[in-house]
């Protein structure tokens, strides 16, 4: 399971001219689900995402996690993160989970975030989405479990 996380001052996702999720300060989490992923991996990735200390403390040091910074999380499904890009000029998506399994794990990940008392907004699974964000820093990390 893969999370591309970006520290943002604001982010939103729109589907068919409807804003489905919007946050201020926090993390935009682009989530990719791979074939071998399960709930245990989702738990571990959620723990890492929410615990990752990439917000500045009073001394300007990256030392706070999203909850300590008073932030929110916007989770957007992105199957392209599971692409194999090693060869050729066209990505292969054979490493991605089947759509039903990917959706179940995406929803599980979102629910785990919400259980941690963090405001968690979402896109819409498998929809054509427009994501807007202001990346603060820029600060972007690839987390994989």
Curated annotation (Swiss-Prot):
It is found in: Cytoplasm. InterPro entries: Daa-tRNA_deacyls_DTD (IPR003732), DTD-like_sf (IPR023509). GO terms for molecular function: D-tyrosyl-tRNA(Tyr) deacylase activity; Gly-tRNA(Ala) deacylase activity; Ser(Gly)-tRNA(Ala) hydrolase activity; tRNA binding. Its EC number is 3.1.1.96. The keyword tRNA-binding applies. One of its GO terms (biological process) is D-amino acid catabolic process. It catalyses: glycyl-tRNA(Ala) + H2O = tRNA(Ala) + glycine + H(+); a D-aminoacyl-tRNA + H2O = a tRNA + a D-alpha-amino acid + H(+). Signal peptide: none annotated. It is an enzyme of class 3 (hydrolase). Its main location: cytoplasm. Keywords: Cytoplasm, Hydrolase, RNA-binding, tRNA-binding. A Gly-cisPro motif from one monomer fits into the active site of the other monomer to allow specific chiral rejection of L-amino acids. Belongs to the DTD family. Homodimer. An aminoacyl-tRNA editing enzyme that deacylates mischarged D-aminoacyl-tRNAs. Also deacylates mischarged glycyl-tRNA(Ala), protecting cells against glycine mischarging by AlaRS. Acts via tRNA-based rather than protein-based catalysis; rejects L-amino acids rather than detecting D-amino acids in the active site. By recycling D-aminoacyl-tRNA to D-amino acids and free tRNA molecules, this enzyme counteracts the toxicity associated with the formation of D-aminoacyl-tRNA entities in vivo and helps enforce protein L-homochirality. HAMAP family: Deacylase_Dtd (MF_00518). This is D-aminoacyl-tRNA deacylase. It comes from Salmonella paratyphi C (strain RKS4594).
